[in-house]
Amino acid sequence: MYKLVLIRHGESTWNKENRFTGWVDVDLTEQGRNEAYQAGELLKEAGYTFDIAYTSVLKRAIRTLWHVQDKMDLMYLPVVHSWRLNERHYGALSGLNKAETAAKFGDEQVLVWRRSYDTPPPALEPTDERAPFNDPRYAKVPREQLPLTECLKDTVARVLPLWNESIAPAVRAGKQVLIAAHGNSLRALIKYLDGISDSDIVGLNIPNGVPLVYELDENLKPIKHYYLGDQDAIAQAQAAVAKQGKAG
């Protein structure tokens, strides 16, 4: 049996402001930093250790990983930073308040943009300052692979090459792997691992800063998965994530 640990970054400044974030590189709040430290404490107390970690190229995930490593005394851990683990790109919604957007377009439309599998939000114009083309962190990524908007289907297609070419081989080699990423890049991976249908994935909400453990068989198929921590608090956090895109 193999184990894989996933963690969504701690609360970011735009999570706190209920704004669509996507590829915008915002930082953690004080609460977000505390969530990351608490995640590290939970993992340490439960006896976990790691051989390698994967994260995105966005600071809220990177800093979450740092805090986990610090708490676990694993600052020396090899870390792979990949744009493929970035949050889903929210296109022209990037930076907008979710509740205000829902008030303007309706809860149903915003739910489709946030959670449907194959409907992307309106795209950015290529000349928009939020477009990734001139960002140095993507200098080595072919321009045609850089998104101006994404649906979850696009995010799955972006994440899976990293899983197939790097993460899965590391797990099969017996390495203890930690992935610190984002709500939708983790939803994309979980959809693949658990074989969740396109319609059922709408209901999956991942709380900030809570370790999610996957136990996998020899074919890397899930045996079971579970969050570490106070289960009632985790359920409340998941419900709060689900409510973010509603006008009321």
UniProtKB/Swiss-Prot annotation:
- Name of the protein in question: 2,3-bisphosphoglycerate-dependent phosphoglycerate mutase
Q: Residues that bind substrate, according to the entry?
A: 8-15, 21-22, 60, 87-90, 98, 114-115, 183-184
Q: Which HAMAP family match?
A: PGAM_GpmA (MF_01039)
User: What protein family is recorded?
Assistant: Belongs to the phosphoglycerate mutase family. BPG-dependent PGAM subfamily.
Return one GO MF term: phosphoglycerate mutase activity
Pathway involvement?
A: Carbohydrate degradation; glycolysis; pyruvate from D-glyceraldehyde 3-phosphate: step 3/5
Instruction: Spell out the subunit comment.
Output: Homodimer.
Residues annotated as the enzyme's active site: H9 (tele-phosphohistidine intermediate), E87 (proton donor/acceptor)
* Record-level GO BP terms: gluconeogenesis; glycolytic process
| PANTHER family listed in its UniProt record | PHOSPHOGLYCERATE MUTASE
Stored Pfam families: His_Phos_1
Gene symbol here is: gpmA
Superkingdom field? Bacteria
Recorded hits in InterPro entries, A to Z, give: His_Pase_superF_clade-1 (IPR013078), His_PPase_superfam (IPR029033), PG/BPGM_mutase_AS (IPR001345), Phosphogly_mut1 (IPR005952)
Look up the EC number in the record and give it: 5.4.2.11
Q: Which organism is it from?
A: Burkholderia orbicola (strain MC0-3)
Question: What is its biological role?
Answer: Catalyzes the interconversion of 2-phosphoglycerate and 3-phosphoglycerate.
Q: Which reaction does it catalyse?
A: (2R)-2-phosphoglycerate = (2R)-3-phosphoglycerate
**Class of this enzyme:** isomerase
Going by the UniProt record, its keywords in alphabetical order are:
Gluconeogenesis, Glycolysis, Isomerase
Q: Where is this site: Transition state stabilizer?
A: H182
